[in-house]
Curated annotation (Swiss-Prot):
Coiled coil: 355-402, 452-506, 574-611, 649-678, 749-823, 865-895
Function: Part of the Rad50/Mre11 complex, which is involved in the early steps of DNA double-strand break (DSB) repair. The complex may facilitate opening of the processed DNA ends to aid in the recruitment of HerA and NurA. Rad50 controls the balance between DNA end bridging and DNA resection via ATP-dependent structural rearrangements of the Rad50/Mre11 complex.
Keywords for this protein: ATP-binding, Coiled coil, DNA damage, DNA repair, Hydrolase, Metal-binding, Nucleotide-binding, Zinc
UniProt family annotation: Belongs to the SMC family. RAD50 subfamily.
Ligand binding (ATP): 12, 32-38, 142, 973-978
Protein name: DNA double-strand break repair Rad50 ATPase
Organism of this sequence: Methanosarcina acetivorans (strain ATCC 35395 / DSM 2834 / JCM 12185 / C2A)
Cofactor binding note: Binds 1 zinc ion per homodimer.
Length: 1074
């Protein structure tokens, strides 16, 4: 992988920057705080986004202060493809938070991903590492130079395993472990399902469903035969009944047709008689019309002679007479108009006179009424005074009858008496109500007592039934407990046998929980021994090669290069040392193989122990279920016993309560009789007191009414006297009015006399005009009558011709009706012949017999059908049971296969888990070996002092530095510069190991190596070695190495140098190429 271009806006101290990366070594220098590390952080963030931020930083810290938007575009080349990541961020000044607004990944110019999380995942996939692995391998940040050294072994193991993709194997092993647990759970569930299915199969088979089904099918077959026979009989009866129905219907239709024909003949005869009558009527009408025609002709001749019309045409005659009548009518209208004016004037005068007369008459009538009213008022006053006297005498008599002497004190005495009687009546009413209330309460209490007795009887029955039911359930539960205890003992015996087998394998019961740990430990030991075995075999092969070469040299006698004798030389000593080392390694290898064989035996025993432990676990589960079931049954027994005791106590209390209620009921009956007597006496006394009170109140009311009536009559007398006075004043006014009306009446009469004379003259003129108009109107009427007679004569002639045609039509109709009567009489005769020999009653009797037989057969069919339905229902239930049995057997077979399958899956998962453990251990051993070789090689290359011999990296990733004298040291005890060298060497060794993983000693797939201030703790000599280390990394294929440093030697040796500066006024950084 190579970085190509970085474009940033508003990131840290950079306002805007477009930076191009070159191949080779690039050194970025500048003063402290100028923005060198910010440039590297921008590259890091361009790759992994906001995931690079630690918990002490937020995204807003990466954005230039005061800016609202920011952008990072990072272009890079990886495995032959060009990639570009565009990221944009938005800052909110209100919330003071920043968020990602855009994240797009392009490959060869094509948009492939447009989302932050997916882009992050794609970059992880491309580089085979996340941001943490990137920091631990390629990007050595400032201040994190000794992170790997100071990390705990577990953390260091995790970091390096993640880089080498070994963490995946551990993840797969954990998944396999989870799968084993799930399979074990499924296996247990399958076993429980097997038990349930077997129990259900046994329950169905115990009912012998096949035998019962055959018997029911035979019965159903017999029932079908009976039904078939009954249906045939029913069909025969229905067919016979249908035939009779048809014959009866045909008989009835013929009778009905005969009646219809007779009725038609009767109607035809009536129509014929009607035709004769109509013909006679038409003939008479023709004769009458001819007579009328003759009379009209004679009348017309007489009219012409009388009126002098002569032989004029009727139209000319009518026109002449209409003109004369119109002239006479106009004269009459003119005279009538003048007469109407005079009449109107006369009417007005007469009306005025009438009104005066009416007014005068009204005044006289009013005068008379006033005089009459005065007399009547005087008579009323006398009557009122007579009524007052009678009422006073009646009141006096009532008071004397009641024993009151004076009228003045009688009202007070009556009031006192009424009050006394009211108090007495109230007391008696209270006594009556009290007695009624007590009686009602007693009756209600008696009713409640009876209801309680009924409820107690029901409760007694329910309690007894509950006691019996509880006893039955206790017996069933105790039986179940005994069976449960027996099953527990059987399972415990089986468990004891399994424990004995487990003990024979050398495992105690308390060690079962640690079997998984033992298994993992043994597998790790096996893997470790396997790794040592392979390492010793490789070393032995190398020693054997060396020994063989030395022997060949010894056989030659001289060194082939310098020609020196080999006896006694250093090569001879080395050969002896190799022989000794070979014997040692062979012995160690044999010991390891023995240990390996023992481990295999232990693993085999452990597998057997695991199987036994699984059986023990299953037994424990079954025992636990049975114990829980027994506990539940025990609780139910205790519950039932407690309920039985409660019900027994309840029975006793109910019996006691029943006796109390019966005693209370008898006492209540006695009390009710006494209260009924008391209530009757109180009611009688109250009625008598109430009667006396009513009489006294009636007397008081009557006296009060008489007094009020007297007062009313005195008021009326006063009113009448006032009316008499008013009537006197009215009489004077009316007399004055009558005098004025008499004067007006005389003037009106004189005016009317003059109008009467003028009216007589106008009426005379009108009579003469009317007479002339009447004569002309009479002549016009005679002319119109002559015209009407002529028209009538034409109509009569036309009518006579129509009547003669109708007479001819009626004669033809009579002939047609005679033919119809003959045809229908013949049809009646034919139908009568067909009906002979068939009697309706006989047919109906036969039909009733067949209908009764059909109903009886239908009832038999219904009973047989119900019987068949019941059989079919039972057959269906049995077939369902057999179907369920087949399904259960299939399910049983499937469950058995599933159990075998799950056992195989569990075994495979266990084997797979062991394989993952073994592979991980093997790969870790190989990686540790390779990493150790690379680490020591680079440490020897980098470290200029000779104080340390080598570095050891054990299987647990513990790092140990050895001095020349063999003394081990912890890396954290080294000096700062030594730790820096050690960290650089370790990072470069990991980088080289990863390069080997990408295919040979090439780093094409790895990101550029970035070193941020690597020379902080290094002296001049080690800085020169750092330059050599950088050259070595270039030689193994690292295409880009980016270093941030102030050191001149690094700057001088770099391929590309850039200077970073910051403007102190704007606080913005910029970069220039040197």
């Amino acid at each position: 992988m190579k970085l190509k271009n970085l474009y940033i806006e508003n990131i840290r101290s950079y306002r805007k920057l477009d930076f191009t990366f070159e191949d080779g070594v690039t050194v970025i220098s500048g003063v402290n705080g100028s923005g060198k590390s910010s440039l590297l952080e921008a590259c890091f963030m361009g790759l992994f986004g906001s995931k690079i931020l630690s918990k002490d930083f937020v995204l807003a810290d990466m954005i230039f202060k005061g800016a609202e938007t920011a952008k990072i575009n990072l272009g890079f080349e990886h495995l032959g493809k060009e990639y570009l990541i565009e990221q944009a961020f938005r800052y909110s000044s209100k919330s003071e938070n920043a968020s990602s607004s855009k994240c797009v990944l392009y490959a060869d110019g094509e948009n492939i991903i447009d989302q932050a999380t997916r882009t992050y995942e794609e970059v992880r996939t491309l580089l085979n590492m996340d941001e943490e692995a990137y920091r631990n391998c390629a990007y050595i940040r400032q201040g994190e130079i000794d992170v790997l050294i100071n990390a705990k072994p577990k953390d260091r193991q995790r970091m390096i395993d993640d880089l080498l993709q070994l963490g995946k194997l551990e993840e797969y092993r954990e998944r396999t472990g989870y799968a084993k647990t799930a399979v074990r759970r499924l296996e247990r569930d399958t076993k429980n399902s097997l038990v349930g299915v077997k129990a259900e199969i046994e329950g169905i088979e115990s009912t012998e469903p096949v035998k019962a089904l055959n018997g029911l099918k035979q019965k159903a077959k017999e029932t079908d035969g009976s039904l078939k026979e009954l249906n045939e009989k029913k069909d025969y009866a229905a067919a016979r009944k249908g035939e009779l129905d048809l014959r009866i219907a045909e008989y009835r239709e013929r009778l009905q047709e005969i009646e219809v024909l007779k009725e038609a003949i009767r109607k035809t005869q009536e129509d014929k008689a009607g035709c004769f009558k109509e013909k006679e009527a038409f003939s008479g009408e023709v004769q009458g019309q001819r007579r009328i025609l003759l009379e009209l002709g004679e009348e017309n001749t007489g009219l012409r002679d009388d009126c002098g019309f002569g032989d004029l045409e009727i139209e000319a005659l009518l026109l002449h007479q209409e003109k004369e009548e119109s002239s006479a009518r106009e004269k009459v209208n003119a005279v009538s108009k003048d007469l109407a004016l005079l009449l109107k004037e006369g009417e007005t005068g007469s009306q005025a006179l009438c009104e005066l007369e009416k007014e005068k008459t009204q005044a006289e009538r009013t005068l008379l009424e006033c005089r009459t009213s005065i007399g009547a008022a005087n008579k009323e006053i006398e009557g009122y005074r007579e009524n007052i006297r009678k009422l006073e005498e009646e009141s006096k008599g009532l008071r004397e009858k009641a024993g009151f002497k004076a009228a003045s004190g009688a009202a007070d005495e009556i009031a006192l008496l009424i009050k006394e009687f009211e108090e007495k009546e109230s007391l008696l009413r209270d006594r009556k109500n009290e007695a009624s209330t007590k009686l009602g309460l007693s009756l209600k209490e008696k009713e409640t007592c009876d209801l309680n007795l009924v409820e107690l009887e029901k409760e007694l029955q329910n309690a007894g039934a509950a006691v019996r039911k509880g006893s039955t359930e206790i017996e069933a539960l105790e039986k179940e407990l005994r069976e449960n205890s027996k099953a527990v003992l059987d399972i415990q015996e089986q468990k004891s046998e399994v424990l004995a087998e487990l003990k024979g394998l050398g495992f105690a019961a308390d060690q079962l929980e640690n079997l998984e740990d033992f298994s993992e430990l043994l597998l790790e030991n096996k893997s470790r021994l396997h790794g040592k075995e392979k390492e010793l075999e490789a070393t032995l092969r190398e020693l054997e090669n060396n020994i063989r070469k030395n022997r060949e040299l010894f056989a030659a006698g001289k060194c082939p290069t310098c020609g020196q004798e080999l006896k006694g030389s250093e090569i001879a000593c080395t050969a002896e040392e190799c022989e000794d080392k070979k014997e040692k390694l062979a012995s160690e290898l044999a010991d390891i193989k023995v240990q390996h064989a023992e481990l295999e035996k232990k693993i085999t025993r452990l597998k057997d122990a695991k199987k036994l432990e699984k059986r023990i676990s299953d037994y424990d589960i079954e025992i636990e279920k049975l114990q829980e079931k027994a506990k539940a049954s025990g609780k139910l027994i205790e519950t039932h016993r407690a309920r039985i005791e409660e019900d027994a106590l309840k029975l006793e209390s109910l019996d006691k309560r029943k006796q109390e209620l019966e005693t209370s009921g008898r006492q209540l009956l006695s009390d009710i009789k006494t209260l009924q007597v008391q209530e009757a006496e109180a009611r009688k006394a109250h009625i008598e007191g109430e009667k006396t009170l009513i009489e006294v109140k009636t007397l008081d009311r009557k006296l009060a009414e008489n007094t009020a009536e007297i007062e009313s009559l005195n008021g009326k007398i006063r009113t009448s006297l006032a009316l008499i006075e008013n009537y006197g004043e009215r009489l004077g006014e009316l007399n004055d009015k009558l005098k004025a009306l008499a004067e007006k009446e005389n003037l009106s009469k004189e005016k009317l006399k003059a109008l009467e004379l003028a009216l007589e003259a106008a009426q005379k003129k009108e009579n003469e005009a009317k007479k002339a108009h009447s004569e002309s109107e009479k002549l016009l009427g005679q002319a119109k009558k002559l015209q009407a007679n002529l028209l009538s004569m034409e109509n009569i002639k036309h009518k006579i011709s129509e009547l003669e045609a109708a007479i001819r039509n009626l004669a033809e109709k009579v002939g047609f009706l005679d033919r119809e009567i003959l045809e229908r009489s013949e049809r009646i005769r034919q139908l009568g012949e067909k009906l002979e020999g068939n009697r309706l009653s006989e047919l109906q009797q036969k039909r009733a017999q067949f209908e009764q037989a059909q109903a009886k057969i239908t009832e038999n069919i219904r009973e047989k059908t119900e019987e068949k339905d019941s059989l079919l229902k039972e057959i269906g239930m049995l077939e369902n049971s057999l179907k369920r049995l087949r399904e259960l057997r299939k399910e049983l077979k499937a469950l058995e296969n599933r159990q075998l399958y799950l056992e195989a899956v569990y075994s495979n998962a266990e084997e797979l888990e062991n394989t993952y453990i073994r592979v991980r251990a093997d790969m870790r051993a190989r990686n540790i070996g390779a990493l150790s070789v690379l680490l020591n090689e680079m440490f020897a290359f980098m470290y200029t002092n000779n104080a340390y011999s080598h570095i050891e990296l054990d299987p647990e990733y513990n790092l140990t530095v050895y001095r020349k004298d063999g003394t081990p040291l912890e890396p954290k005890l080294l000096s700062g510069g030594e730790r820096a060298i050690f960290n650089l060497v370790l990072r470069c060794a990991i980088y080289r190991l990863l390069a080997l993983g990408f295919g040979g000693d090439k780093a094409d797939g790895l990101p550029p190596m970035i070193l941020d201030e690597p020379t902080v703790f290094l002296d001049r000599g080690h800085i020169r070695q750092l330059l050599k280390l950088i050259d070595m990394m270039r030689s193994i294929g690292v295409g880009q190495i980016i270093v941030v440093s102030h050191d001149d030697s690094l700057i001088d040796s770099a391929d590309h140098v850039f200077q970073v500066e910051k403007d102190p006024l704007t606080n913005m950084s910029s970069i220039t190429r040197l």
